Amino acid sequence: AVLDWAVGRNVGFSKFVSLGNKADISESDILEFLADDPSTRVILGYVESIDDGRRFLRAARNVTPRKPVIVVKAGATAAGARAASSHTGSLAGSDRAYAAAFRQGGVLRAGTVEDLFDLALGFAMQPLPLGDRLLILTNAGGPGILAADTAERLGIPLAEVSAPLRARIFPALPPTSSLGNPVDIIGDARADRYGSVLSALRDEPSVDAVLVLLTPQAMTEPEETARATVSAFAGSGKTVLASFLGEATVASSRRILSEGGVPNYAVPERAVRTLYAMLRYSRIRRAAGHVTGEAPSVRPEKAERIVSETLAAGRRALGEEESRGILEAYGFTFPRHAFAGTSDGAVAAYREMGSGSVVMKIVSPQILHKTDVGGVRLDLRGEEDVARAFMEITSSVRRLAPSAWIAGVSIQEMVTGGRELIVGMSRDPQFGPLLMFGLGGIYVEVLKDVSFRVAPVSRSDAGEMVREIRSWPLLAAYRGREPADEGAIVEALMRVSRLSCDFPEIQELDINPLLVMSKGKGILAIDCRMTVAEAP
C-alpha cells in the first residue's frame, strides 16, 4: 500500500524494510544503517513496539540531526497497546514514554498514516524553511481563513505584508483584493495574477514559506497556475506548499505540482500541519549536540547504603526517613524535621524545634498515601496540639490500615508560600527511567498536567519539561506575583535524572509536594516516597 501511494505521488523509496516479528533485526539496526545511506533523505516508520528503547533513542539522536525520521506509533491507547503486544509478542510500553523518547530523539510523530504521507511529501520535495513566517495566497476567503486558523493554533506566525511588497504586487491585483495575510486575489484570478504575486514572493526576505491555495471557479486556470507556482520558486530555496482544492478539475494540476516538486494537499489544514512539522524539525537540527549535564554535590555512597539495607531487609517501600536520606545525598533540602515514636517523643521533638507551626505525618513503610488513612495533620501550634495529633493519627491509621506497621510520626516545620510541584520517576520496560514533572499537591490526580522525559536529561530537556505543562503560566510572573525559581526546578530534575541512572534499583520515586519559591530562593522537598527492587 505504501509503495502504491508513493508511485501515485511521485515519491521514490530508496529502501523498503519489513521487520516482521524482529527475531534478529530491529528498528534500531535499520536506523543505524540508514543514517549513513546516501540515497535516503527522509526516513518513515510504522512502529508497534520497540524492544530496546534506549538503543533506539541513541540511534535516533545520531540520525535526526542529519535526516528527518517520521514515525507512526500504533498502540497509543490501552486497547491498541494490547493488540500491538499480541501482534508482536513484546510489551508495547507506555505511550507517554514513547512520546518523550521521540521528542528527545528528534523523531517526528505522525498521528495517522495520512499524516505520515503528508509529512513525507513535504520533507521529500521541499527545502526546510529558514524561518517561521508564513504567507498564504488564496483566490477564496474561506480556505485562507482555515489555513490562518490552523497556523495560529500551531503557533506559526503569519508574515507581515510590508509596504515594499504591497507596492510590488498591488499593480497586478484588482482593487477588491485583500493585501493582508492571507493575501486574497479573489475568485476571478487567472494564472498570470497568481504568477505576478508569486514572483514577488520568491525573493521577499520577510516571507519564509508560502502556501498557495486555489479553489476552481469559472475563470480559474488550475494547470497554468500550477506551472506558474513551480516556475516561480524553482531553485529559490524557499519553502512552498500548495492546496488545490477539488478532485477531477484539479487532478492534472496536482500532477504538474508533484512533478515540479511542490507538494499538494487536499485541504489547507493538512498543508499547514506539514509546515509545522518542518519547522519543528528545523529547531531539532539547530538544537542538536546538547550534552547531558551533571548534577553537582551528590553523595552516592550514602544513597547506596540506604538502598542496600532496604533490599537486604526484604522490603520494597522505603520509609520517609530513608527516602529523605537518599534525596539529601543528591542535594535536596527539606524543612527542619524530627522523628518520634511516642506522644511524649513528639512533644519533645516539637520543643527542640522551637515555637511555631508544624506538620505531623505518619511513618509506615506500608503506607504510601498518608492522607488516605488520616495520617497527616497540618498547622499544629503548641504541645497540646502535637500530643492530640499523635493520638488522632495513630488511631486513624490503626482503623483504616490495620495491617500497617506504625513506626511513629514525622514532625516537620510548616512552610508557607511557594508553589507546589511534583517531580517523579518510574521505570518503563523499554526506555528505562522516565522522569515526570507537573503541578503538585492535590492537583496531580485532578489535572494530570504533567510532562515526561527519558533519563538522563540535558538542561535543555529539563527546561522544556517545565515550560511544556499547560499550567506553566502559573509559574511565571502574574498579577504582581514574582516568577518561580525555574533554575532551581531544572536543577531538581537534573538531580533526579542522575539519581535514577545511578541506581537502577530505584523503581519509583515521587517528591510531592516540591515547594518552589520565587526566583533566586530555591526549592524545598516537603514529602517523598520511593520503592526499590533488585536491579535486572
Residue ranges of predicted features:
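Catalytic-core regions of core metabolic enzymes
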Residues: 1-536
